[in-house]
C-alpha cells in the first residue's frame, strides 16, 4: 500500500468540443490515492480563468485510461494492471454523466409490456416527411390495449383489437403504429388522417388498418425499418416474420382461411372481437425466417444495412440474417437464454441482455468459428433477467437496460459497472412484483420505463452528459 506522499506523473487531455474545457498538456505529479473527485478538482483548478472566484460552479468530470473509465483510485488501477507508480499515465477527461433524476409518472390500467416514443426529430418522423409539434408516448399493456399519452400524462387515444396481452408496440410514422401480442397477431393501426397515403375512407382514426397473420405463438417483439417500410417480428413459434408497413405489398388472406388461428375460448368478449375482426383485411408475411430452435425473444434491423437483421433467442444464440434471401448467415452461441437486443452502430457492437442477469457485448463483424463465443465484454449489475435495452440518443457509448429486478440501469460500455441505477419512484409492490418490462431513452422526454407497477416512469435523460 502506497503512502499519501506517493505520486505519479500524469498528462491530462480531452476530446471535448468545448474549447473552454481544454487545458495545458503539461505533465503533473499527483498523489496515487486520488479518485475521480480529486482529479476533477485538479482539472477545474487548471481550467479556472483569471478573475474567477472559488464560487464558480465546478464542472464534474469522468476520467478514462486507455479508453476505460476510471472507477477506482489511481493506486488501485496501477495494482490491478501491474504497473509501477514510476509509470506515466495519460488521463482523458470528459464531462461526467449526471444522475437521471425523477421527472414524472403516469398511471396505466394494467402491466406495461412495451413502450415507444415519437418526437419531432425521431427517425419515424423524418422518414415520413411529416412533422409533429409535441412528443408522445406509445404503450402496450397486458389488458390488450394500445395507448398514446401526451406529456401531461393524458391518454389521447386507445386502440382496442387484440384478444390478449400486448407484447410490443412501435411507431411507424406520426399516423401509423404497429403492435403485436399473445394472440399471435401483428396489427397495423391508423392513428390519424395521412394525406400522403390513400386509405379506404371507411377506416376510422384509431382503428385497425390490417391484421398481419402467420405466427403460431405469441409475438413478443417488433422492429421497424423506416426508410424501406419494413417490419420484423419475433415469435415464440421460433420464427421471425418479415413484413411491410404498407399492407398493399403483402398477399391477402381471406378471413375464413384463418379462423383456425382464433384462440379457442368461450369468452363472450373474445367471440365478439373475433366477429369484428372478420371484416378487417388480413395479410401474410413477405417471408418467414426459420432457424432458431427455441422461442425468439428480440429482433432488430442493422442500423446501416436494412437488408441485415439480428435476433436473439432462448436457444442461447444470436443470429444474423440476410433479409433478401431469408437465410441465416451467422450464428454465435452463448451459455444462456438471450432476452433483449440492441445495436451500438458507431462502436460496431451488439448488446444482449440475458437470463443470466448480465449484459454481453458482441462484434457482429467477427464471424463465429466455434460453438462457444467467448471474446466478448460482460457487464454485471442486474440481479434478474435483463429484458429491455435502449440506446442513449446523445452518447454513442451509453445505453439503458431494464430488468425483472425492478430497476433500470444506465451504462457506459467503457465501464464494467453501471453508472446509475433507477428504481421505481413509488414502489409499493411486493418483492418480485416490481418487474420492469420496457425502457426507452428519448432525447426529448427522457428515460421512460414501465412494468408491473402499472406506471410509466420518466427520468431525466437529456443533458445528463453535459
UniProtKB/Swiss-Prot annotation:
Gene Ontology molecular function terms on file: ribonucleoprotein complex binding
Extent of the WD repeats: 120-159, 161-199, 214-253, 291-331, 333-372, 381-421, 431-466
Region called Ubiquitin-like (UBL) domain, residue ranges: 8-95
Top-level lineage group: Eukaryota
Keywords: Nucleus, Repeat, Ribosome biogenesis, rRNA processing, WD repeat
Annotated spans, Sufficient for interaction with ERB1 and association with 66S pre-ribosomes: 105-466
Gene Ontology cellular component terms for the protein in this record: nucleoplasm; PeBoW complex; preribosome, large subunit precursor
UniProt cross-references to PROSITE patterns, sorted A to Z: WD_REPEATS_2, WD_REPEATS_REGION
Subcellular location, record wording: Nucleus, Nucleolus; Nucleus, Nucleoplasm
Family classification: Belongs to the WD repeat WDR12/YTM1 family.
Quaternary context: Component of the NOP7 complex, composed of ERB1, NOP7 and YTM1. The complex is held together by ERB1, which interacts with NOP7 via its N-terminal domain and with YTM1 via a high-affinity interaction between the seven-bladed beta-propeller domains of the 2 proteins. The NOP7 complex associates with the 66S pre-ribosome. Interacts (via UBL domain) with MDN1 (via VWFA/MIDAS domain).
Name assigned to this protein: Ribosome biogenesis protein YTM1
Gene assigned in the entry: YTM1
Amino acid at each position: 500500500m502506497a503512502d499519501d506522499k506517493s505520486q505519479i506523473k500524469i498528462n491530462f487531455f480531452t476530446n471535448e468540443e468545448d474549447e473552454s474545457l481544454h487545458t495545458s498538456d503539461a505533465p503533473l505529479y499527483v498523489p496515487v490515492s486520488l479518485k475521480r473527485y480529486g482529479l476533477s478538482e485538479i482539472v477545474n483548478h487548471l481550467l479556472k480563468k483569471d478573475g474567477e472566484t472559488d464560487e464558480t460552479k465546478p464542472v464534474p468530470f469522468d476520467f478514462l485510461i486507455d479508453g476505460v473509465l476510471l472507477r477506482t483510485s489511481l493506486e488501485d488501477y496501477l495494482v490491478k494492471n501491474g504497473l509501477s507508480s514510476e509509470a506515466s499515465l495519460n488521463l482523458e477527461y470528459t464531462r461526467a454523466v449526471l444522475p437521471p433524476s425523477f421527472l414524472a409518472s403516469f398511471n396505466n390500467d394494467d402491466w406495461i409490456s412495451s413502450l415507444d416514443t415519437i418526437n419531432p426529430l425521431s427517425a419515424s418522423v423524418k422518414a415520413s416527411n411529416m412533422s409533429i409539434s409535441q412528443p408522445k408516448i406509445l404503450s402496450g399493456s397486458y389488458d390488450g390495449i394500445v395507448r398514446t399519452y401526451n406529456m401531461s400524462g393524458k391518454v389521447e387515444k386507445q386502440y382496442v383489437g387484440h384478444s390478449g396481452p400486448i407484447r410490443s408496440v412501435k411507431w411507424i410514422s406520426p399516423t401509423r403504429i404497429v403492435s403485436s401480442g399473445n394472440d399471435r397477431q401483428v396489427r397495423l393501426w391508423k392513428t390519424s388522417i395521412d394525406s400522403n397515403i390513400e386509405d379506404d375512407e371507411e377506416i376510422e382514426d384509431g382503428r385497425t388498418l390490417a391484421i398481419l397473420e402467420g405466427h403460431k405463438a405469441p409475438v413478443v417483439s417488433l422492429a421497424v425499418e423506416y426508410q424501406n417500410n419494413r417490419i420484423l417480428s419475433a415469435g415464440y413459434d421460433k420464427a421471425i416474420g418479415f413484413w411491410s408497413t404498407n399492407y398493399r405489398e403483402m398477399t391477402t388472406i381471406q378471413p375464413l382461411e384463418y379462423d383456425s388461428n382464433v384462440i379457442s375460448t368461450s369468452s363472450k368478449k373474445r367471440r365478439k372481437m373475433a366477429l369484428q375482426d372478420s371484416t378487417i383485411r388480413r395479410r401474410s408475411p413477405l417471408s418467414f425466417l426459420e432457424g432458431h430452435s427455441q422461442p425468439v425473444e428480440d429482433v432488430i434491423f442493422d442500423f446501416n444495412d436494412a437488408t441485415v437483421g439480428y435476433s436473439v433467442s432462448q436457444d442461447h444464440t444470436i443470429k444474423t440474417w440476410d433479409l433478401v434471401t431469408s437465410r441465416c448467415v451467422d450464428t454465435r452461441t452463448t451459455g444462456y437464454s438471450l432476452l433483449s437486443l440492441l445495436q451500438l452502430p458507431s462502436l460496431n457492437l451488439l448488446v444482449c441482455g440475458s437470463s443470466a442477469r448480465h449484459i454481453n457485448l458482441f462484434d457482429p463483424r467477427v464471424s463465429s468459428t466455434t460453438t462457444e463465443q467467448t471474446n466478448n465484454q460482460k457487464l454485471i449489475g442486474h440481479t434478474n433477467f435483463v429484458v429491455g435495452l435502449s440506446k442513449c440518443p446523445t452518447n454513442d457509448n451509453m445505453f439503458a437496460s431494464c430488468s425483472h429486478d425492478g430497476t433500470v440501469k444506465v451504462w457506459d460500455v467503457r465501464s464494467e459497472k453501471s453508472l446509475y441505477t433507477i428504481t421505481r419512484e413509488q414502489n409499493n409492490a411486493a418483492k418480485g412484483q416490481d418487474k420492469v418490462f420496457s425502457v426507452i431513452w428519448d432525447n426529448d422526454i427522457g428515460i421512460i420505463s414501465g412494468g408491473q407497477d402499472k406506471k410509466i416512469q420518466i427520468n431525466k435523460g437529456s443533458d445528463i452528459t453535459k
